[in-house]
Amino acid sequence: FSILFKLDYRYINELSCCGDDFDYYSHALTIAVDNDFDYSNQLNPSKSTFYVDGKVAPLGFYGSGLLAAPFILVGSLFDSIFVDSYIPYKIIIYSLSSLIYLFFTAYLIFKSLLLLNLKPNFTFIILSLTGSGLGFYAFERYSMTHVYEAFSVALIFYSVVKISLNKEKRIFYFLLAFSLFIALSVRYTNYHLLIA
């Protein structure tokens, strides 16, 4: 269990390696810092960067960046206050976003199963999620989409359970639409969620 708290990978100044990691981080950074999708004014391109018309153009979908952007915004605020930090707070707090979404994924699954009167075990849910490989992506490859995708599916599940059990459904229909939008923007292969 203690291996999950390995923190040395968070001690980087900027995420610029590994194509997918760089792409998802690029989306989060540009959304949080200046609210546009112009990547040229935030990032130093790496050898794996993709370009369109001479401009940085990340290939990954923007959904995980949209979910992680508030964390980068908070980290950027800390960076502007504590300017002498060796490790940027935006990286540290960004790396925690996947852990927080993993916890909320477990919580939404737990809450949904409680609403269905199934007596879930929260520890078992946490162990199932981390044992499925999500732990690796939450702790080690925190900018990848896997945890954000699990969160969006758990949010869809929770929304459907609430819609089926509540008389006042309007807010949960909105939550379902939002969670479907997030699921599709995190990874387009989630279109199968629309079919069900």
Task: Go through each PLM region and give its residues.
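Hydrophobic transmembrane alpha-helices
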Residues: 72, 76, 106-114, 132, ...
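Short, hydrophobic secondary-structure boundary micro-motifs
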Residues: 39-42, 136-139, 194
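Membrane-interface alpha helices of multi-pass inner-membrane proteins
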Residues: 28, 125, 172-188, 194-195
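Short acidic/glycine- and proline-prone juxtamembrane loop motifs at membrane-interface regions
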Residues: 140-148
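Membrane-embedded alpha-helical segments of multi-pass membrane proteins
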Residues: 19-20, 62-66, 92-104, 147-155, ...
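Short hydrophobic/aromatic helix or loop-helix immediately within or flanking a transmembrane segment
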Residues: 29, 45-85, 147
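Transmembrane-helix signature of polytopic, membrane-embedded enzymes
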Residues: 80-91, 104-132, 151, 165-175
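Transmembrane signal-anchor helices characteristic of membrane glycosylation enzymes that use polyprenol
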Residues: 1-18, 26-29, 36, 132-134, ...
